[in-house]
Structure formats: C-alpha cells, structure tokens
Amino acid sequence: MSTTVIILAAGKGTRMRSQLPKVLQPLAGRPLLGHVIKTAKQLLAENIITIYGHGGDHVKKTFAQENIQWVEQAEQLGTGHAVQMTLPVLPKDGISLILYGDVPLVRQTTLEQLIEVSNKTGIGMITLHVDNPTGYGRIVRQDGKIQAIVEHKDATEAQRQIQEINTGIYCVSNAKLHEWLPKLSNENAQGEYYLTDIVAMAVADGLEIASIQPELAFEVEGVNDRLQLAALEREFQKQQAKELMQQGVTFADPARFDLRGTVKVGHDVRIDVNVIIEGNCELGDFVEIGAGCILKNTTIAAGTKVQAYSVFDGAVVGENTQIGPFARLRPGAKLANEVHIGNFVEVKNTTIGLGSKANHFTYLGDAEIGAESNIGAGTITCNYDGANKHKTTIGDAVFIGSNSSLVAPVTIGNGATVGAGSVITKDVAEQSLSFERAQQISKANYQRPQKLKK
C-alpha cells in the first residue's frame, strides 16, 4: 500500500518573534521542517505533500532540492482546511500520514507502528496521557473505544478532566480523506475547520479508531516559542547522548554535549564536556575528544586523541594521531597515521604523511607532506599570490626550521633541511640544506636608549 505524508507547515509562528518562518527555526542543527521531511523519507513515502503559508517562498527555497509537492494555504482557517487544500493532488488510494512542521521529533518506528495499526481499520492516531491537558483536544472514549475529539474551548467541564489528549498525528486511508474532508464544518468556538472532526465521521461510519502512544513524550511535542524550542533541544540532546552511551561512548557530562547531525562511533570512545558534533562524523575505537572541540563532517580513526578546543571541518584523520590543543583542521585536511598536529596549527587542503609533525603555530595550506617530516614552529606555506592558490610539496624525512616561509609553488625534496627563518622561493633538492636570511650584524658594548627625564 502506497504511503503519502502530508506535512502542515503554514503557521505564522507569531510567538517566535522572528523574521524566520517557524518551521525553519533550527533544532539540533536542522530546520524543524527538515526533521519531519527526513522522517518521511525514512518511511519511503511515495509522496510528500507540504502545505505552506507564511514565508512560503523562503520555506520552499530552503527545501528546493527535496522531492516535495507544495500546496499553498493562503488563509489559515484550521487544520482541516489545510488538509482540504491537498485534495486536488492527494492520491485516491493508499494511506496518508498527517504530520506537522513544528512537531519535529516523532520517530520512524512510532510512525511505522501507527501505520500498522491503522491498516486494520482505515484510521488511526497518536494520543498521549499528560498531567496537565489544558489547551489540548481531549480524547473521548466509550467502553475503551475512541468516540470523538473535543477541543478544549468546546469541551464541557467533565470532558476537561480527561487527561488523554490528541497529538494531531493521524494515519487515514486516502479514500476516506476524499470522502470526509469536503464535509468539514466551521461551526465551532474558533470558527475553524477542525481536522479532528474526521474522528466523529469515522465513528458515524462504524469504524473503530486505532490509537498508539509514543515511547517518548517529546516525540509529539510542538514548538510555538523559543522557550519550547530550547526545552525540546535539550530533551533531544539528552536522548541522543543516552543512545551513544548505550553504544559504548563515555561522556564526562552527557548534559554538556550537542549532536547536530549524525555520528558513527567505535568502542570505548571518550568525549569531554562542551563538545559539538555537526554534519556526518565518524569516531573510531578508543578515540578521545577533549573539552570544547567542534567536529563537522569529519572522520577520526582509532586511537587518535584530540586535545581541548580543536576545530575540525571536513577532515580525515588517521590512527593514533595526536591533535591540539587549539588546532584547526579545515576542508581537505587528510592526516595519515601517527601524525602530530599541535597548538595553533591550521591545516587546509593538505595531506600529511605517516608520522609527520607540525607541533606549533603553523599554517599548512594546499600542501602535500610526506612521511616522518618535521615542520618547525611558525612555518607558513604561502599558498596565495593574490589571485590564485599554489601547491607546496614537502617530501619524506624533511626538516623545516622554525619561522620559515615556503612560497608556493615550491617543492622540498626528500631528506632536505630548511634553515630557521628562511623564505624559500625555489625548489630544494633532496638531502640538501637550504637557508635564506640577511647577514647577522652584532655591535659590541651596545647601549640602549635611555628614557628622558621629565
């Protein structure tokens, strides 16, 4: 049976007090709506229909690369009205999941369970038991079976005591949506077309409404303001840290860790406080990440230790490598095994061979460095001439003295030595010594200037 996912994303988000549409507010490094689209794709939905309204052009532009059908809701006249807008493009057969762009964290497994129970009856929903149901639609049951959903403003005092609430997430046969949606009425306290009225229609048709409860309550929590956004962020990060610990990761403090993407971890990984992981990362066995590090789209192989406040973006790091503190690896940085990158060293678009070292205050850009070479403190590859980037090639077992400038394009041959303080503008042959500096001048018995007396 084919699956369509309908995502309601037309809300204005006034309480966010933001120029950014609510569904584009970031949570764990991804727009709220992006989380929902990701889950829809995980379900292998044949169709994803997203209903847009306020800030629609911005929303559509953000997800221009996604295979989505966009439907406009020019006037926000309720959730039922929003889904009515999809009828011209909604398939006649199959089922539809109805989700929300501001309810970002409902899990694939939960929705798969909802689909399974709904297939038996033609309609199903996710409900939740809460201590304080104020403001939510109540689930009215008779003999355990759902009879209706009553919105808070329309509920009697007795109905307001019910603690089972409607999350708004449904799975309904498309045939029934085509039958029920045109019949919706706005004769209620809000003057809106309630999607919840399809429940009463199902009961009138003699259908039993299936329901499930989510394993985690935050799966169905919506976001209306920045307080709720921050609270949901922390709940989600807490859950992600828990899952990583179950995979064998040790955190110095799981409450001070943010995962804003995905990470694949090996055995016995250790992560200190205030580490942020973004994009798609991979950490091998026995990797250690120091405090305050930021990793983005980076792979770090087994046994590597990263000291505090190092930043990685698009880097590939080999085994048993030592990095930091305060190192920066930019896109294109590729480090072989047993490399040492020390404090205040920046590496960009550069490969570094087995066992080579750059321990202090160095910039290595657009370079290729062989094995067992030593790059002295203060060395700079001068890769940019003001118009174009050029490559520096350093062979195996090369020794670059401190405070050297290597003006690309230039090649330093295997086994060569560059004297400290040199500005190298020409290739250096293998096994040779090259240095370039002004002649030292020394003056005996030199007297420093004295401060004038006032």
Swiss-Prot record:
Residues reported in the UniProt entry to bind acetyl-CoA? 377, 383-384, 402, 420, 437
Q: Which residues bind Mg(2+)?
A: 102, 224
Q: Where is this region: N-acetyltransferase?
A: 248-454
> Which residues participate in UDP-N-acetyl-alpha-D-glucosamine binding?
8-11, 22, 73, 78-79, 100-102, 137, 151, 166, 224, 330, 348, 363, 374
Looking at the keywords, is Acyltransferase present? yes
Residues at the active site: 360
Q: Does the keyword Transmembrane helix apply?
A: no
Pathway annotation from the record: Nucleotide-sugar biosynthesis; UDP-N-acetyl-alpha-D-glucosamine biosynthesis; N-acetyl-alpha-D-glucosamine 1-phosphate from alpha-D-glucosamine 6-phosphate (route II): step 2/2; Nucleotide-sugar biosynthesis; UDP-N-acetyl-alpha-D-glucosamine biosynthesis; UDP-N-acetyl-alpha-D-glucosamine from N-acetyl-alpha-D-glucosamine 1-phosphate: step 1/1; Bacterial outer membrane biogenesis; LPS lipid A biosynthesis
Biological process terms in GO annotation:
cell morphogenesis; cell wall organization; lipid A biosynthetic process; peptidoglycan biosynthetic process; regulation of cell shape; UDP-N-acetylglucosamine biosynthetic process
Sequence similarity = In the N-terminal section; belongs to the N-acetylglucosamine-1-phosphate uridyltransferase family.
What name goes with this protein?
Bifunctional protein GlmU
What's the source species' lineage?
Bacteria, Pseudomonadati, Pseudomonadota, Gammaproteobacteria, Moraxellales
- Give the encoding gene's name: glmU
